[in-house]
């Protein structure tokens, strides 16, 4: 792993932007994208930049099950608001959380990933070590699948909803095996609440109990962390 330590999340977004810019300039055409609060400053930099993604494909990690793309809490809505409405991509893909045929939805997304090998995969890090919505216990060779969210993940996401009862309890997520197929993985984690997961991811045992620990086995991983997230290294 290439570990980049920064003072704060703003500096982290600047370093992540440089990696996106360099990767695009070198001819990359497929970018795996993430949601949540961590990548928002990065997306703002991409929107304000002269970078041209009009020939690039974006493939998102996950989506809540049961939310339509028009729901303000959906990741379709999030990506439109923060990136896709402002920066043109050739094509964009996000898992279909409304497809009643779950097998079809997961199989379709696996085909999309197979047909568009990811050059750079952006990741955040959950407090319990999840990547995407791959919760502890997820098989390292997993493909796109339906996830029962843990209570800690539900609690962490509750701040985005008016009432905790409105927080979805399931999601459709790219699998860990799919994430690991990317040529380059870029993970960002900021804040003291991520320190335990960061330490276990980087120096702990490789175990499905801590999904992000599998990144130790990938040949090209960049981790951007601030001082608070690095406190327990």
From Swiss-Prot:
S-adenosyl-L-methionine recorded as keyword: no
Reactions catalysed according to its record: alpha-D-glucosamine 6-phosphate + H2O = beta-D-fructose 6-phosphate + NH4(+)
GO terms of molecular function: glucosamine-6-phosphate deaminase activity; identical protein binding
GO biological process, alphabetically ordered: carbohydrate metabolic process; glucosamine catabolic process; N-acetylglucosamine catabolic process; N-acetylneuraminate catabolic process
Domain of life where this protein originates: Bacteria
Keywords: Carbohydrate metabolism, Hydrolase
One Gene Ontology cellular component: cytoplasm
Entry EC no(s): 3.5.99.6
Record-annotated active site: 62, 128, 130, 135
Pathway listed: Amino-sugar metabolism; N-acetylneuraminate degradation; D-fructose 6-phosphate from N-acetylneuraminate: step 5/5
PANTHER family hit by this protein: GLUCOSAMINE-6-PHOSPHATE ISOMERASE
Xref: NCBIfam families: nagB
The name this protein goes by in its record: Glucosamine-6-phosphate deaminase
Protein source organism: Leuconostoc citreum (strain KM20)
Gene, per the UniProt record: nagB
